[in-house]
Amino acid sequence: MDLETINVEKIEKVAIIKLNRPELLNAVNEQLVWDFQKATESVKNDESIRVVIITGSGRGFSAGADLSERKASWKGSKDALMRGYKPFFENITSMPKPVIGAIAGPAAGIGAAIAMSCDLRVMSDDSYILSVFSNIAL
């Protein structure tokens, strides 16, 4: 599977989905949303996979949304939620196999939501989950 912002690795019966924008602490942009949907759909439909691990590349799980993105194709917030984020999270929560969040470093904003959507979270000593939505009036 050729994805720009996600790496998918299969080790025996385990699929590892890795957010791969380490230079931006795996900040979630539109491309990552589409790539994540493809990756989770593929893993969901692969009957040989028994467990899914979601993690981040580099020194963080995810710093949250990429607020610097200017050229998204969303037609407003409702479109982003309905076409992008709703299926993004439904693919995690409806996964017919256990989903483990392997969290190193920050999981903030949308990264925190990804972590909390997993069935189980395993965190390093320096990890933290930060819900920043109230700080930005969401």
Locations of regions flagged by a protein language model:
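Hydrophobic alpha-helical membrane-association signature
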Residues: 32-36, 84, 114
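Hydrophobic/aromatic residues within transmembrane alpha-helices
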Residues: 17, 54, 66, 114-115
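CoA-thioester-processing core
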Residues: 88-94, 102, 108-138
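Glycine- (often His-adjacent) and acidic-residue-rich active-site loop
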Residues: 56-91, 107
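Conserved CoA-thioester-binding segment of acyl-CoA-metabolizing enzymes
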Residues: 1-57, 90
